[in-house]
Swiss-Prot record:
Its EC number is 1.1.5.4. Pathway: Carbohydrate metabolism; tricarboxylic acid cycle; oxaloacetate from (S)-malate (quinone route): step 1/1. Pfam families: Mqo. This is Probable malate:quinone oxidoreductase. It catalyses: (S)-malate + a quinone = a quinol + oxaloacetate.
């Protein structure tokens, strides 16, 4: 019996079976149904790394509650620009998922997306002033028109009882709430997308490592494959390659040798969460409650107490507690970081180490935290939390981008970045948050960079799939409201009224 893929040629090879590759594959099947596509995933199922529901927080990132997307300037003002951009991006994701559901291309949306109000919650006078300023900056905008603000313990308790019960009634607190927020199981969505691909002619290969990549004489790429369990080896030629292997993308991008990959490095940050599966406790909390990050903390370390829906069951999640591991993947190797160091990226990496002492100090402090300290951090958001109701789980790895900078030598960049070869034959995605929630606009950006000639001809189809494509919804309130209603109906999102 042969385990290794025997396919010799493909128009497109997708490396990695996470939400990014699955999304790109779904786009290509819609835009170019006759193209041959092969997907290779090193694990035995799709979406088991960063896309897995317990490896990420599952927040449908729309900047409704994440304070790091709209930080205070030195003068105390808050710019809404980044929050607006992220919200616009998430609206595109909602529209694409709705298109797939409406066309019966994927299964019930209840399996991957549910309504969960998004809240920001802060403690103390300074943080309260900031939150009110943020609310006043966002509220006038179409995409944030439903946002509510309160400093009243009683009102906040109606929104999220667990964060108020047992709290000192004199403590200064403030919260905002957006009732239309969502919780997304990106693992379930990834499985739906890969099932759709497999049912429509895409060759899906699990348990396959892509061990090498080299430029072919015809402008395409030759990839070497290994099936670790059987020890078999294989090869495949592709006209186009997408490296969507999460934390594993950097190594393959470096192996490609394209000039655009030079100077990039990765900084891995691991994380842990507390999880509560007690249904009586979970039933008392229906919100994703985001707070303020500690000084020096990376953006993905903002503390939050979340309602989660995984496999139809409701549970609670709190964290993350950051840590450090040299792995680039949860199922990776401790050698991932040292083996990623190249002559072209060592200077940017050293510059980042020098300029980010706050982050280093934060990670050392987090790694040294005892279990009791972690429980106390939970009680800042859930005062009556009992240690025995929560289990500590390890989340997925987040590899932040290190890149060259003409002034500093190198910078640590939070977020995601599309890297594309000049000839359009290869594309890759590096980075993390907001990540999965913006998979749709990120893959559209990749398509534009790697298929510029085809992209012009795809405009009509993209508009059919996503009626808000190419439109700033924040500047078109009627269309924004119409699409919000339509996507909520398609995705079977329950309406949660304000002030409840």
């Amino acid at each position: 019996m042969t385990f290794i893929s025997k396919t010799q040629h493909a128009d497109v090879v997708l490396i990695g079976g996470g939400i990014m590759s699955a999304t790109l594959g779904a786009f290509l099947k819609q835009l170019e149904p006759n193209w041959t596509i092969s997907l290779f995933e090193r694990l035995d199922q799709p979406g088991l790394e960063s896309s897995d529901p317990w490896n990420n927080a599952g927040t449908g990132h729309a900047a409704l509650c994440e304070l790091n997307y709209s930080p205070a300037a030195k003068d105390g003002s808050v710019s809404p620009a980044k929050a607006l951009l992220i919200n616009e991006q998430f609206q595109l994701s909602r529209q694409f998922w709705s298109h797939l559901v409406d066309g019966n291309l994927i299964g019930s949306p209840k399996g991957f997306i549910n309504t969960v109000p998004h809240m920001s919650f802060v403690i103390g006078d300074d943080h309260t002033r900031f939150l009110k300023t943020r609310y006043e900056a966002l509220k006038p905008h179409t995409l944030f028109r439903s946002m509510e603000y309160s400093e009243d313990h009683g009102q906040i308790a109606k929104w999220a009882p667990l964060i108020v019960k047992g709290r000192n009634a004199q403590q200064k607190v403030a919260a905002t709430r957006a009732a239309e927020g969502t919780d997304v199981d990106f693992g379930a969505l990834t499985r739906e997308l890969t099932t759709y691909l497999g049912n429509n002619g895409v060759e899906i290969n699990y348990g396959h490592d892509v061990t090498g990549i080299s430029k072919a004489s015809d402008g395409g790429w030759d990839l070497t494959l290994k099936h670790p369990r059987s020890g078999e080896h294989g090869r495949i030629h592709a006209k186009f390659v997408f490296v969507g292997a999460g934390g594993g993308a950097l190594h393959l991008l470096q192996a490609s040798g394209i000039p655009e990959s030079k100077g990039y490095g990765g900084f891995p940050v691991s994380g842990q969460f507390f999880r509560c599966t007690d249904e009586t406790i979970a039933a008392q909390h229906s919100a994703k409650v985001y707070g303020q990050a500690s000084v020096g903390a990376p953006p993905m370390s903002v503390p939050h107490l979340d309602t989660r829906y995984v496999n139809g069951k409701r549970s609670l999640l709190f964290g993350p507690y950051a840590g450090f591991s040299t792995n680039f993947l949860k199922n990776g190797s401790y050698l991932d970081l040292p083996l990623s160091i190249r002559p072209g990226n060592i200077i940017p990496m050293l510059a980042v180490a020098k300029d980010n002492m706050d982050l280093t100090a934060y990670l050392i402090k987090e790694v040294a935290k005892r279990h009791g300290d972690k429980v106390e951090a939970l009680r800042e958001y859930y005062p009556e939390a009992k240690d025995g109701d929560w289990e500590l789980i390890t989340a997925g790895q987040r590899v932040q981008i290190i890149k060259k900078d003409p002034q500093k030598g190198g910078i640590l960049q939070f977020g995601t970045e599309v890297i594309a070869g000049r000839d359009g034959s290869i594309g890759a995605l590096l980075g993390a948050s907001p990540g999965a929630s913006t998979a749709v606009p990120i893959m559209i950006e990749l398509l534009q960079k790697t298929f510029p000639k085809n992209f012009k001809g795809w405009q009509g189809k993209l508009k059919d799939m996503m009626p808000g494509y190419g439109v700033k919804l924040d500047e078109n309130p009627e269309l924004a409201a119409e699409l919000e209603r339509a996507t909520a109906k398609s995705l079977q999102l329950e309406s949660v009224s304000a002030s409840n």
